[in-house]
Structure formats: structure tokens, C-alpha cells
Amino acid sequence: FRRVLFRSTIPALIAGVLLKHIVEGLFKKPFLEAGIRLLTAAALMTLAEYFGKRTRSLSGMTWFDALIVGLMQILAVFPGASRSGSTISAGMLCGFDRPSAARFAFLMSIPVMLAASTYELLDVIKMHNLGSFLPLLAIGFVTAAIVGWLSIKWLLNYLTRNSLYSF
């Protein structure tokens, strides 16, 4: 399973590096860009609910399934894109049930988020007055980790009983 998980993260890691300058330019029109991505996520989730077979679990995941879900994770590098929405939808379109698709989507986010955070941390370390910001950065990091964990836990529980239509 670790190999499949690793393979699923490769597309987003490559896209993050190659598209960095293009994506930074998109933040000049954030409302338009975010609107386009939110509508795309809504369409993907609707298609996943309508066409997804939802009969498979993570134990049946192949490298090809992981690649498909990983390719959808590329959308997350663009402003306003829902990483979880696009990857959960891709998992469901590959035939996975909602909870399995969501679990995989969140597991595959860990390596990508760690890589992106490490990359951004290199810029933070170069700050002249870093010492004065460290307490705020630490509070922000801990708060984000706790809220993220609680949100994922809630969403996994929600998706065992409900569809993606409400999103």
C-alpha cells in the first residue's frame, strides 16, 4: 500500500515544481480563478456521486487507480481548487466507496503537504526578523494541525453516511 500511496503523490510534486510561477500569476485574479476551480470541484463531485460504482475498498487499489487520483491532485496547486474534492471524486470514479476514497485522499496529501511546507519553510528561514515571528508561526502551525485533524475526522465520519452533493 505504501508504494501505491507514494506513486499517487508523484504527479502533484512534479506539477508543484513545474507550475509554481504560473500558479503565482493566477493569484492576480483570485476571485475568477477560485470561482472556476470551485465550479470544477462541484462538477467532479456530482459526476462521482452519479457515476461512481462505490463497490471497492482500499485493499483493492492498484497503481493505476493511485495514478488517476494523483493526477487529480494536480488541480490543488491552482487557487481555489479543492484538493480533497477532486481526489475523493477521482477515487469514487475509480469505483471506491466514499470513506475509502476519502481516506486515500487524505493519506496521499501528507507527503505533498510536507514537501510543500518544507519548500515554503526555506523562504521563512531567510527572514531577517524570524525570531519575533516564531511564536506566531508555532501557534499557527499547532492550530492548523488540530483543526485539520478534527476536520478530516469529521469529514470521514460524514462520508460514511452522506453523499458529496451537499458540498
Regions found by a protein language model. Give the residues of each.
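Multi-pass membrane proteins that catalyze or facilitate reactions on polyprenyl-/lipid-phosphate substrates
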Residues: 1-166
